[in-house]
């Protein structure tokens, strides 16, 4: 393809609302344009990258035995009401009514639709297992869409759904999809890690996230340096360590005027934060609950929500805190907490040790509080966020906390949807059984952005070869030089015959502009044809990733290019 015929509107400056590198570079490279908040148009170059990701996803899904379908984006409310998610999904579900006053939504996911489809078709165990997938546009009405394609409201997603006779079959389907995902992200040239994860609003018993490793990632991972354990910090287990502090003495009330935070109380009383207990108040499915962690720890709200089995968990408002405790925020404690009947504590707090807690009284705390003696704890559980100082829960090794971007998620759904929607089949004995489900998602458009977050430099995008809109940027420095133009056309024809996508820059622009644009759009292989080089019988080749330059002979170019390209691919691990 000739650049002069392409629509590639590159920009020198990024838009002011672009916060992350991928957003800035996707706009500057002319790959996306914003329509409205969280909604983007894919320009020709961006769509080429998106389609290349989708093609690899499609190949590996087909290879794993899944079959492609295409389901409607508009979904009727009655299906969501069957599973109960119409009420609990939240405001991310965009609801609307048609002219006949019937309720619908724009699909953020398709569990209900696919289950309705399969329950109407499958009657016998002989028809199972089934794995159906689609690559389709989704919509989630994010409250704060940001970071371009990383957290938009409209996005392209691959979602697959498996239906099996029993849990053993579901486990096999899960393994097949897990393996397919490893192949997909390896083929894309991404550095990634599969980690144990929380199932969130999708539900189910077990799940893994596939994370692209990037310092700009929104997710934090807990990765053991000694074994294979890896988990999202929301899921990461913390091994309980026995409290060795002395048993509590007599409970005592102490004034703490104006000390609302852990830091302020610690400073006022002259003690370290690990001698205090935080009492955090929440509303779980409309019911007040309290959660306790050590003062220097962070509560893991996902663990608390899972412990409660709650559909919703929200931090109590200042007004609710005062109504339940009789004190303003900052003085809540587990002793005499009459407005909250359910109190949970982290395992680290179990025992007779003396702690400092809020007194449920303004400007007052209690010392020497034993949770065993002085408070009514419903249960002790792992409720805290893992830190780098905590040991691996599997082997006791050291834990690192790298950042990652979620690009894929696989779930064992079990009977969550099939049971509520009565998706059944007749087994070998003619007995009715409920299908066991799994679901498997990949954020196709997010993969493009994540790739750029992981692969960029000061000059622009550094695309891995499988994702690049054009693998080869062929720079013709002087289009008016007939000999150079003829040689460029010859090289272009050879490369295309070899199966490479080639962008021949034949624009009437200064060489400096061409070099800058080639770096910006991120083609992994750059070839430069200039009059001086051709006079010496060479074509300059640049590895976009390493920046290394070499000269390839015009005579024998084919073999020289193949050898050079093999070296570039090796650097990518491809």
Curated annotation (Swiss-Prot):
The entry's function note states: Catalyzes the attachment of proline to tRNA(Pro) in a two-step reaction: proline is first activated by ATP to form Pro-AMP and then transferred to the acceptor end of tRNA(Pro). As ProRS can inadvertently accommodate and process non-cognate amino acids such as alanine and cysteine, to avoid such errors it has two additional distinct editing activities against alanine. One activity is designated as 'pretransfer' editing and involves the tRNA(Pro)-independent hydrolysis of activated Ala-AMP.
Similarity annotation: Belongs to the class-II aminoacyl-tRNA synthetase family. ProS type 1 subfamily.
Localization annotation: Cytoplasm
**What EC number(s) has UniProt assigned to this enzyme?**
6.1.1.15
Natural source organism: Nitratidesulfovibrio vulgaris (strain DP4) (Desulfovibrio vulgaris)
Q: Which gene encodes it?
A: proS
- Tell me the Gene Ontology biological-process terms attached to this UniProt entry: prolyl-tRNA aminoacylation
SUPFAM superfamilies for the chain = Class II aaRS ABD-related (SSF52954), Class II aaRS and biotin synthetases (SSF55681), YbaK/ProRS associated domain (SSF55826)
Name of the protein: Proline--tRNA ligase
Single GO MF descriptor: proline-tRNA ligase activity
- Pfam hit, one: tRNA-synt_2b
Where does this chain mainly localize? cytoplasm
Entry's NCBIfam families?
PRK09194.1 (NF006625), proS_fam_II (TIGR00409)
Please name the PANTHER family in this protein's record. MITOCHONDRIAL RIBOSOME PROTEIN L39/PROLYL-TRNA LIGASE FAMILY MEMBER (PTHR42753), PROLINE--TRNA LIGASE (PTHR42753:SF2)
Leading EC class:
ligase
